[in-house]
Amino acid sequence: MSAYANKRFLVIDDLPLARESLRAIAQSVGAFAVEFASNYQDALYRIRNNTPDVILCDYMLGDGRSGQQLLEELRRFGLLSDDTIFMMVTGEQAYEQVVAAVELVPDDYIIKPFSPDKLLLRLDRISAKKKFFAGYYREKRRQDYAAALAVLARNKEDEAGRPYRFEILRQEAEAHLASGNAGAAEAAYRSILTDYEFPWARAGVARSLHRQNRHVEARAEIEQVVAGTPSYFDAADLKASICMAQGEHAEAQRVLDEVARKTPRNFLRKRLLAEAATLNGDAETARAALADVIANDSMPGAVSPADQLALARSQVAAGDSIAAEKVLLGLRESEVKGFDLALQASYVALLALTSPERGAPRLAGLRPALLDTELPTDTRIDVLRAALAGADAELAERQARSLMAGPEAKKVFALLRKAYTLHGRDADLREIQRQVALERIHHEPTAGAGPAAA
Amino acid sequence: MHRLLDILASGVHDAKNQLFAAESMIATAEKAHGVDLGEARYAIEAAAGRLSRTLTTYRLLRHGASLAVVPTVVADLCEEVLLAQAKQLERAGVRLGLACSVLDEWPLDRDLVGDILNNAVQNAGRHARSRVELSAVLEGGDLVLRVEDDGPGFADPSTAAAGGTGLLVGERLAALHVRRGRSGALLLCNGGRLGGAVFELRLP
């Protein structure tokens, strides 16, 4: 009896002939239960409801979707268990170029036509590999990164790990990055690069530098990747994020515009585009992108209150208070009560901007908390705008100071200036800027002591 | 220029889907009736391989061709060549041996290198008396993949590469594998361990 007799297979392909062929091959390796999915949504639905053991997914799914996008979405929502085998099936070389470049790869990919024997060989190898990394996956899932790294260190010494030496290094880098140790991740990616110039490893260096707020270096690294592998869209996303951190919002939007056009149904990218457009002052593009996300990102739970707030924010920026108010009031009161402080603050600040009589009293209620709590950047900007509109100079100044002193100062400076200019208070912002700069100089000797002593 | 490549690629893609359908029907029939139709499946795979290779040749011989380099387990790559070719060679009375002493992963274009090795083994099988051997070893920091046979050898190894498309692609493919400033090479000679033709792909 075949080792795959009791396994549940899912075949994903939009073409009936190809689907039938994949099923026949799966059955000839002994698979008893073979299910079909004919499109992206159907595949997501089946995988969510009853995760198969083996997924054979064609790279081209039609309707502007690809198997790679499905894989990314499954990982993003944690819908693939560690034991599930995801095998990409491809008829042409386009996918090989993708898999050679990207960070997120399937367990394997196979080129049509292939014999049942070849499929069996590949499945057996994937199973062996999963078994080898089982201990690591377990710790990673529990987010115990120290333990996960300890397992990898043992794997490295293990003779059985020799066929996986790049995979071990790659996982090591990812675990460092996930645990927040961007410096160690950078070193791990660089050690891969001394062996071979993989685009995903170069992008990993850029990502690690970006996390360390070393944006100029990160930018140089990612430009190299984007130039060398134009089909590596995640690299373009990363480049855009770095550009935003550097305050180069027009370039960020240009890059995202270009890749978003090639991947019209990638809604994470659309959100990023909206962020760049907002920072770039192009409220119309931001609004269109977010409306598309909210209407079409059909993954259950994918559209979050944060998306609704982002849409309202872009409408406020576009000067369309009525539409923004409609979005905000569309959120149920019970839902708003369940928000954390940051989301609540954004909600009431945006409401205060669109409908002062409703929003201002609620903003006043949150005011004490907002004066001395750490808040995310988006929220700070919302609060700052509402405070300026409500002539609450102290609340506005508190937000502006934190933003100017923080790592995202370059990213948000243009927005801050615009907000202050709108209320004719440029002088206030210049004064805040001066004070933050003075404080920075004041703190420099202590900040510089580390490297100097070393 | 890119447009022409897209048209060719899409035609090859469709044809391969059809061939895959044919292969899967044969596999179903084999299972249902307990027969071995391996030869028919082999012919289908060979046709698909030929189509791919034609496209690859066109792609690689243009300017600006790029590889898809992935970490590849060398032993697995060799094993797949064995799986694809051993039975067919056996039918012609030729035994295909495998000797792989490389345990690690190697950065290479898995599918193109696999294709070139399949092609080399097929060629060797046509000229061998009774044996073909595929081997993988590390030599001076290079991965060396060799296909040797016990046939009469190349008439003139120095001009052999100009004769066949497969060899031409092999040369280009080897040259495109660049690592730490060094590039790969394709070498042809006579002699070797089996006394016949030797096809050697060296990858840095």
Which sequence ranges carry the predicted segments?
Chain B
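Conserved catalytic submotifs in the C-terminal HATPase_c
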Residues: 95-104
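Histidine phosphotransfer helical core of two-component systems
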Residues: 3-7, 19-49
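Conserved DHp (HisKA) dimerization/phosphotransfer helix of two-component histidine kinases, i.e.
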Residues: 38-92
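Glycine-rich/acidic phosphate-handling loop/turn and adjacent ATP-lid/helix
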Residues: 146-168
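Hydrophobic residues in the alpha-helical elements that line and stabilize the ATP-binding pocket
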Residues: 116, 120
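Short helix-loop "hinge" at the ATP-lid/N-box region of the Bergerat-fold HATPase_c
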Residues: 123-125
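Short beta-strand/loop element within the Bergerat-fold HATPase_c
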Residues: 131-141
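Glycine-rich ATP-binding loops of the HATPase_c
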Residues: 176-192
